[in-house]
Amino acid sequence: MEKLSETTPNGTSPRTFALNHSRPRSSFKGCSRISDYELLGKLGEGTFGEVHRARLRKTGALVALKKIIMHHEKDGFPITALREIKLLKLLSHKNILRLEDMAIEHPTRQTDKRKKPIVYMATPYMDHDLSGLLDNPSVQFKEPQIKCYMLQLLEGLRYLHDSRILHRDMKAANLLINNKGILQIADFGLARHYDGRTPESGVPMGEGKRDYTGLVVTRWYRPPELLLQLRQYTPAIDVWGVGCVFGEMLYGKPILAGESDAAQLDIIWDLMGSPNEENMPRWKSLPGADHLTPRPRTGNLETRFRQYGSGAVSLLKELLRLDWRTRINAVDALQHPWFKMQPLPLEPHEIPTYEESHELDRRKFHDRKAALPPAPKGGTVGVGPDANGATAGFNSNEPYGNGRNGVNGGRYRNGPDDRRPAWQRERGAGLPPRPPPNNDDADFRERGPPRARGPPGPRGPDVDTYIPAYNRDDPGRRRDDRPPPPRDDRPPPRDDRRRRNSREDRRFDRDRGTMSRSRSPRHDRSRDRDRPDHNGYRR
């Protein structure tokens, strides 16, 4: 066996060579300890973690610490968190959230040594998220401010798509804004690289090249091609989400708030028109369209958004185009004439400052729980009591002018409905109301869990296939995607017989001379007294 050389080609020892060519130790940055931060309060809780406001003790800088929740510790570190960390370390853009540090919280007591350390992601603290701002009744968006936010959102999206990254969960709650007017795209737990060309000016995205999971994007921001189970999708799915966010900023609340997959498609057809070979070619060939026969309708987007001007309507129609192959891309959307119309967009530093507004602050503003259906967990199917998500916040037969940013203002109405029971009130954009009481179900909270999901296939009319389980009555409870135990659908045993468990009942029976299984009758039976050999019963 040949002996390895003890020197490098230039005559130095391997150790000396390594020391001469090594990076300085100051260039390596490991993970901080959670004790390096002072926790200041909880900002929110999502599918994959909690977010806390904190201050770095060394510099005093405010950060957001995202606690990565280990739902199934035996499975190891969540793949979604690994993917998010990897992508955030690769990206660098003013409109993309930056990952600044990772922090570790080790078990403190000797008895907790078997527990795994808790990992936190540290990002710059942002004063608001767009969903929280839209729910803040003291905030009123004007057109120049909406244009400023839309330009920043499209700039960030163009950078992502130029980097061949799909976000796959574009929604208002994932858009962070600070009091300097800067908007940043956050939450890359569902993001991934995609195979395909990057967007070009004047060139539609066309067809996708490979299959991806369809269990992505929160329902209210989900494009029709995903609802119809297209697997070879493109960056056009993110553009649809931007269109939903744009309409939400104009109107003041989500414009496509469906209660289930089928309902989501129905309100999309109401807004954009029924699919046909002109506006959505070959839509019938999609797996989820086999049994669909939507009633003919022309769409009412122009009527509903007419008050916001022809430019806004034109951009919204391009962003929400049913045909994903010809849907506008971020490059062309940035050049849309609406941004050059009066009033012109504000500069970020010209946008007014607001009190801190995050998705969790909905309870502070309106004393209600979060309205959004939870984001799907990529690649898995969730089951749980909230399979149909939240109720719709948009009536397709109602003009958009009554939204909070519309001509009539007042997103949250007070009226005679406030004195009705919860199950009789009109549904808003919040949680589903409590069902009415009935004789067959004395306490609806005691119902068993829903049936477990079956294998993939044609969906029923009101079954949602991607909403993970949450107990909305207990917001601190972790999600559980494991299927529920088998449900026994047999009716309960009858309990309508009178039970003689008391001494008084037995005494009452004896006094009335009723028959009893536990003792002989006190008096002779008439048929026995008539017998010739009768001597009488003796006790």
UniProtKB/Swiss-Prot annotation:
Residues 37-339 form the Protein kinase domain. SUPFAM superfamilies: Protein kinase-like (PK-like). Residues 1-27, 370-539 are annotated as: Disordered. It comes from the Eukaryota. Its main location: nucleus. Pfam families: Pkinase. It is an enzyme of class 2 (transferase). The keyword ATP-binding applies. Residues 1-15 have a biased composition (Polar residues). Keywords: ATP-binding, Kinase, Nucleotide-binding, Nucleus, Serine/threonine-protein kinase, Transferase. ATP binds at residues 43-51, 66. Signal peptide: none annotated. Its EC number is 2.7.11.22, 2.7.11.23. Serine/threonine-protein kinase involved in transcription regulation. Phosphorylates the UBC2/RAD6 ubiquitin-conjugating enzyme (E2), leading to monoubiquitination of histone H2B and the silencing of telomeric-associated genes. Also required for histone H3 methylation. Necessary for the recovery from pheromone-induced growth arrest in the cell cycle G1 phase. Belongs to the protein kinase superfamily. CMGC Ser/Thr protein kinase family. CDC2/CDKX subfamily. This is Serine/threonine-protein kinase BUR1. It comes from Gibberella zeae (strain ATCC MYA-4620 / CBS 123657 / FGSC 9075 / NRRL 31084 / PH-1) (Wheat head blight fungus). The gene is BUR1.
